[in-house]
Amino acid sequence: MLLSETHFWTTLREDVVRIKSQDLGAFRYLRQRDKEQEQQDLACLAKRDYTERRNGLAVLKNSGRKSTGRLKDNLKKLEDLLRQHRIIHSEWQDAAQVLLLFSHGLIAHICVDIYTGDILRMVFEKYLVGKLASEVITDAFFTRSHIVLAYNTNQLTVVHLQRPNARSQGPEKIANMDPRIFHVIIPGATERKLSRHLTVNASFDLFVVWTQSSQNEVYPWRPTIRDQDRANIHVFKIKGLQLESIAYCWSENDPLCVDFLRSSESQIITLEQKVSRKGDISAEICSYELAAGKMQRTAITSIPMGAQICSFAFSPDQEKLFLGSVDRNICLHDLVQQSTKYANQIEIVPNQCAWHCDSAMLCVANERSVLQCFDLALATIGHQLVSENVTPSSLLDLSHYFVAQPTLLSVAFSRKPDLSTFKHTYAQTDCLLLLVYEQGPLACMRIFGGTGMRGDIHNSGLTADVIADKYLRLQQPDRAVNVLAALNWETYGAMCLITLHKIANYVFFGGDQRRPRIELMARALKTFAHTLSEETKDEFSDQVYDLKRRFCFYLLRKNLFAEAFEIAQDVADYDIFMDLYNLTKCISSLSEFAQVAFSQAAAIIHEEDRANGNLSLTCDLRSESACSLSTCSDMLRGQGAGTAPETGLGASQPQSQQVLKNYVPPLPSFKSKVFNAEMIKINIPKPELRPPLPKVSIAPPTSSLASLTLKSNSSLQQAPAKSLHPNGNLWSQDVPDQTVGLPMASSPLPRLPPSNIPDQSAQLGQFSTMPASPPPTGSYQPKFYQHPLVSGNIPAMLPSLTSEDYQKRLLQKKPTASILSNPANPAPTNGEAPATPAKSQTAEKNKVKFSDTIQVAVVPEIPRKEKPMPPKRNGYSRPAARHLTNPKKELADSLPLCHPNDEYLKDFNPITTNVTKPPIRRREEEPKSSSKGGNSSSSSSSIKVVHFGVV
C-alpha cells in the first residue's frame, strides 16, 4: 500500500552498503572513479540514467559554486564525524532541513530535496566547540532565538541569538547572528550525575528540565537541602538573557516523557512508568497545572503494560499515545476518548517509533532496520520499495543492504511541508523518514504512497481519509471503518465526514451487495455518537442525517426490513415508517412488523403535533417520501369506495390506515450552509387570486394510539363533506401547489356524486370536531395596508371600504408625478403650462401615465424576530417535521425575501385611499416667489420614493 525508496547518504561502495544494480528502490552516491569503473555495466548505466532523468543525484562531485559548497568533501567529513562522535540530538527543523548535534558540540545542517531525498547542501557549525560547561551533553533544543544545552550535571548552557536568521531557506552561521553565551546552575542533586532532558513549548518561552525520579532511593538527610534540589521536574521561563524558575515537582515514578500541552501551555503532560511491589508494570499519564510556583497534578490515567516499555511517542496532535514493550506488545491510547487498543505479539520488537506528521500513521522499527507501519486502528499497512513487481508486505527489511549490520538509533518523520515554498507540477512526495545508525551511515526514505501534494483534505500527506480511501480501493472496507472509528469527530469532523461519504459510496455503488458491507455501513454511521458536543452536532448532523436516510431507503430496496427499521428508529422520520408499512403490509409473514411500523409513524405524528402545539389531525398529513406518493383523487376514490359506514375500532383501523398512507408529499425542504432559501426568488401571486386559508379547529389530545388513528379517520372523512365549493369541486381551497409550495387557485378535480360520500357523523359523533368552513369566495375581500413613506412602525390594519366609497376616493385622488421624470426640466402635464415667463403654451389634454396608476411605499424597518431553534431528536438537530401540511406555515417558509414572513404579503398590497396622505404641494398653491425669479426652471413636482426593500 505504501510505496517508497531509500537513499543512503554515503559514498562507500562495498564497505558498508551493498546495493544491486537492478534494485530501483535503493540508492547510494557514486564517486567519479566508481563511475568510470561501471561504464561497462549496462545495468548500472541504466539505473544512473533512471536517477538523473528524475532530477536525482547519482554521481557525487564538488561544485564550484560557493552556495552549494563542496558536497563530496562535506559528505566524507560527515561520515568521519559519525564514526568518531555520538549524535546527541537530531531533528527536522522543517520539511527539508535536518539538524544534527554531536557530542563535542559540532552542529551539522543538511538541506534535503523533498522530491528526490538527495542532499542539496551541508553546513557545519563549530561555534559551540570548546565552549561547553561540561564534558557530556545529554540533550538540547534549538529555537529561532535561543540554543539551550543540558548536561549530566545541574548546569545549562544558553546561547541567545540577538539577530535571528532572517533567511527563508538554508542555515546561517551562529557568529553572524550576534550570539551571547552564558552558563546557568539550576537546582538539583549535585552528588549524582543524571542525564537531563529538555522540552520546549510551542511559544519558545517556557521549557522543562527533567531527570529520573529518586523517591524510591535513600538520601542522606541534611538540613541544608531544599525541595527544589529533590525535585526532578523543573520549569523555566526564558526571555532574552534572563532565565527564571517558574515551578518544580517531584514525580512519584520515573518519567519517560514530559511535554507541554498544545491546547494550553500552562499545563504539562507526563508519561511515567510505574512498577508495583508485585512487579506489575504500567504506564501512567499525568497532567500538571502550573500555578503559584508549583505543579499541581490534576489528572492521572493508568495503562497496564505487563512488560518494560521500550518505545513511546505522543502523536503530533497529542490525541494518541503509542506504547511498545519488550515482549512485542503494543498499544494505542486515545487521550480524548479515553480508550486503549492493544495488538499482541507483533513481528518485531518495537525499539524505535515515530509518528507521521498527519497523526494518522506511525512507524516502528527494531535495531536491525526492520520497519512496520500501523494505522490508527493498529492494523498493519503494506509497505514495499519501488520495484518492477508488486510485492507489498507488512514488514520492510533493510538489513540486507548492510555488510555489517549497524544498530538503528532513531527514526523520525519530516514535518509537514509548506506548499507555498515548494512549486512543482508533477512531483509527488508525502514525507521523508530519517534513519540514524550508530557510527553511520544516514539514510532517508522518501514515501510517496499517498496522493502527493494534492487530493486530500490537507493537500499533502497521508491523512486518515487518504488511508481509508486506499483501503476501499483494495476491497478492505472493514479497515476503512476501523480508521473512521478511531477518528475524533470533535477535532477531525470534516475528515470524518469525508471518510463516511467514501464508505457510503463504496456500499451504495459497489458491484456485489453483501450483508457484511451493510453491517459495516451501519457501524460507520454509529461513529457519529449522541455524546458529541452540541457544536459538532449542529455542524455535521444534517449531512449525517441525509446519509442515514439514503442508507435506510437503500435497505428498503434490498428488502432488508429489519435493518431498515433499526435505522428508521434512529432517524425518527414519519415517511420511512410509512414506506416500511407499505412494503410489508402485503407480506403475510410480516403483518405484525407492518403494524409496528404503522404505530411508530402514528406515534411520531402525535409527538411532533404535541410539540408544535397543534393537537388536531384534521389537517392534511402528507409524507415526504416518493415511495408513498399519491394524489388527492386517489384519496377521494379510496373514501368513496366504501358503501356502508362501519362502526367500532376494528372497522375504523383499516380506513385510517388507508387514509394515513395516501397523503401527497410536499416539496422536500433542506438546510444547507451554501444554498439557502434566501437565494430563491419566488413570484408571489396577487391577493385577488389567493384563496383564504382554511381554519383548523383545536381538539383535545387523544389518550391512546387507537383513538388517534380513529380520530384522524373521522376528521378526514368529514372534511370533504363540509368543504364543497359552489362549483362542485372538492377541497378547492386547500390543495397545495406541489411545484412551488404555495396554495393555488381552485383547480378542477374529478367530480364525485354526493351519494358516494358516506356520512359518519352519527356513528363517530364522540370523536368528530366542528371545523369552521371558510367564507365563500364571492364574499371574500382582501384587507389592505397602508405604509408610511418614511421609516417607522407599520400601523394597524384599517377597515375595508365599500365599492362606492372606493370609487369616490379614486376620483378625488390627485395624480402624482412619475419617479422617472426629470425634475430639472419637467414636461407639461394635466393641462398646466410650464412656469417659464418668456414662453407660454396652450393647455394639453390630460394623459394617463404609468405613475398615475400605481402607488408604492417604502417598506419600513421591522425588528427581526428570533427564530426558534429546530427541535433536537436522538442527540442531533435536524429540520423540523415536514409531513404536517400547514398552509400558513408553508407560505411563510417559502417567502424569505423579507424577514417578517407572517406579515410579508401586506407590503405588496394596493394602498387604500382612506388614509391621510402626506401633504402634496400643488402647483397652484406654490408661492409666487418661485415664478418671479430669473431662472427658467419650473417648480419640482412631488415625487414618491420607490424602494422595494427594507430602509
UniProtKB/Swiss-Prot annotation:
Its main location: membrane. Pfam families: Frtz. WD repeats lie at residues 304-343, 345-384. InterPro entries: Frtz, WD40/YVTN_repeat-like_dom_sf, WD40_repeat_dom_sf. Residues 930-942 have a biased composition (Low complexity). One of its GO terms (biological process) is establishment of protein localization. Residues 709-720, 757-771, 818-828 have a biased composition (Polar residues). Gene3D superfamilies: YVTN repeat-like/Quinoprotein amine dehydrogenase (2.130.10.10). GO terms for cellular component: axonemal basal plate; cytosol; plasma membrane. Keywords: Cell membrane, Cell projection, Cilium, Cilium biogenesis/degradation, Cytoplasm, Cytoskeleton, Membrane, Repeat, WD repeat. This is WD repeat-containing and planar cell polarity effector protein fritz. Belongs to the WD repeat fritz family. It is found in: Cell membrane; Cytoplasm, Cytoskeleton, Cilium axoneme. Probable effector of the planar cell polarity signaling pathway which regulates the septin cytoskeleton in both ciliogenesis and collective cell movements. Functions cell autonomously to regulate wing cell hair polarity and number. It comes from Drosophila melanogaster (Fruit fly). Residues 709-776, 816-883, 903-951 are annotated as: Disordered. The keyword Transcription regulation does not apply.
